[in-house]
């Protein structure tokens, strides 16, 4: 079966997904696109040589009975409304993060999906598909370093767009680590605190504090510290270190070429964009989603519930930004519907 896909949003990320669906992966065909910028949608069809319809909006695209799955790749504030409308159809849904920009919006999506016969939503938390992070989790799960005691991570960007706000340090940047650590440790958060170190002189965005340090605690007692530094200038990096009872696991910043040692110096390249760093992870997550849709089986990747957990934690982090105090996190138990990766209602 060739999965027929409609893409909602043809900006940079939408075009990247169209490219991989059309030219890199197997089993899918982009048959419809839409964007609030109609010319951008037309350009995507033209540039990628698609045999696809261009719809004026998401509502009309979602009414197309020939579409098996939709990719929601619009700006974050539009995700909730589109996903809720998509849940009124029989289509599978791949939505980029965030699931919704508010806690209440994420809860509305979860509540609506719970009325369906099976899971249909996958959220684009691609970190789970990174080969290095997966390998680290596999090692951790063997118990080779004992129980995880402390996790240290960094999320470094060279710079950010002029519309990047202080809140987006959480909802656009830290959100990746929020989901990653929840999955990596198989644990629930109990609190989060955001603190502001010395302000970087490189910050140009009004109201933005950079860097920021997030400290999270979990039910099992692990303490997680994440440095978010989005005006670092020198490049893009993610770092991860897990300190256990009997050892440590570290994620190398791999894939950037050889390390050169010469004339008493050591050099290696530093990536400037997250796109190249995680291209393999994006390809793997989308291929897995397409393969599940082709079998008419529920997605096995990050679920709407995972998106809801991330939204709860992000909302607490945004509150902590205001006074840099610790904010408690209390999440109800995971519904049975979301406990089984292949959850289907009887």
Swiss-Prot record:
Gene3D superfamilies per the UniProt record, alphabetical: Dihydrodipicolinate Reductase, domain 2, NAD(P)-binding Rossmann-like Domain
Enzyme nomenclature, EC number: 1.1.1.18, 1.1.1.369
Gene: iolG
Name of the protein described by the UniProt record: Inositol 2-dehydrogenase/D-chiro-inositol 3-dehydrogenase
InterPro entries for the chain: Gfo-Idh-MocA_inositol_DH (IPR050424), Gfo/Idh/MocA-like_OxRdtase_C (IPR004104), Gfo/Idh/MocA-like_OxRdtase_N (IPR000683), MI/DCI_dehydrogenase (IPR023794), NAD(P)-bd_dom_sf (IPR036291)
Native species: Lacticaseibacillus casei (Lactobacillus casei)
UniProt keyword annotations, A-Z: NAD, Oxidoreductase
Reactions that this protein is recorded to catalyse: myo-inositol + NAD(+) = scyllo-inosose + NADH + H(+); 1D-chiro-inositol + NAD(+) = scyllo-inosine + NADH + H(+)
Pathway noted in the entry: Polyol metabolism; myo-inositol degradation into acetyl-CoA; acetyl-CoA from myo-inositol: step 1/7
Record family assignment: Belongs to the Gfo/Idh/MocA family.
Cited function: Involved in the oxidation of myo-inositol (MI) and D-chiro-inositol (DCI) to 2-keto-myo-inositol (2KMI or 2-inosose) and 1-keto-D-chiro-inositol (1KDCI), respectively.
Biological process terms in GO annotation: inositol catabolic process
Subunit note: Homotetramer.
Molecular function in Gene Ontology: inositol 2-dehydrogenase (NAD+) activity; nucleotide binding
Lineage, top ranks: Bacteria, Bacillati, Bacillota, Bacilli, Lactobacillales
Enzyme class at the top of the EC tree: oxidoreductase
Listed transmembrane segments: none
């Amino acid at each position: 079966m060739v999965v027929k896909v409609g893409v909602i949003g043809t900006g940079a990320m939408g075009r990247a997904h169209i490219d991989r669906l059309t030219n890199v992966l197997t089993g899918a065909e982009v048959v419809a696109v839409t964007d609030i910028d109609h010319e951008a949608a037309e350009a995507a069809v033209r540039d990628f040589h698609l045999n696809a319809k261009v719809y004026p909006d998401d509502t009309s695209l979602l009414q197309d009975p020939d579409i098996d799955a939709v990719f929601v790749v619009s700006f974050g504030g539009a995700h909730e409304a589109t996903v809720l409308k998509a849940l009124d159809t029989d289509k599978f849904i791949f939505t980029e993060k965030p699931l919704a920009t508010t806690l209440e919006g994420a809860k509305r999506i979860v509540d609506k999906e719970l009325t369906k016969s099976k899971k249909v939503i996958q959220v684009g938390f691609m970190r789970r598909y990174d080969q290095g992070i997966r390998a680290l989790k596999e090692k951790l799960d063997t118990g080779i370093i004992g129980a995880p005691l402390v996790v240290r991570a960094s999320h470094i960007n060279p710079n950010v767009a002029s519309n990047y706000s202080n809140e987006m340090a959480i909802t656009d940047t830290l959100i990746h680590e929020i989901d990653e650590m929840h999955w990596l440790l198989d644990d629930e958060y109990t609190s989060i605190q955001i603190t502001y170190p010395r302000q970087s002189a490189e910050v140009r965005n009004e109201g933005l504090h950079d860097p920021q340090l997030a400290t999270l605690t979990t039910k099992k007692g692990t303490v997680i510290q994440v440095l978010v530094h989005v005006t670092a200038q020198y490049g893009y990096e993610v770092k991860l270190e897990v300190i256990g009872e009997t050892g440590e696991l570290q994620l190398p910043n791999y894939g950037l070429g050889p390390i050169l040692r010469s004339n008493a110096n050591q050099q290696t390249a530093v990536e400037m964009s997250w796109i190249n760093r995680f291209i393999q992870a994006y390809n793997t997550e989308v291929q897995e989603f397409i393969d599940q849709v082709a079998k008419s089986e529920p997605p096995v990747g990050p679920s709407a519930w995972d998106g809801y957990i991330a939204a709860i934690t992000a909302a607490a982090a945004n509150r902590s930004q205001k006074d840099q105090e610790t904010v408690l996190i209390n999440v109800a138990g995971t519904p049975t519907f979301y406990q089984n990766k292949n959850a289907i209602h009887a």
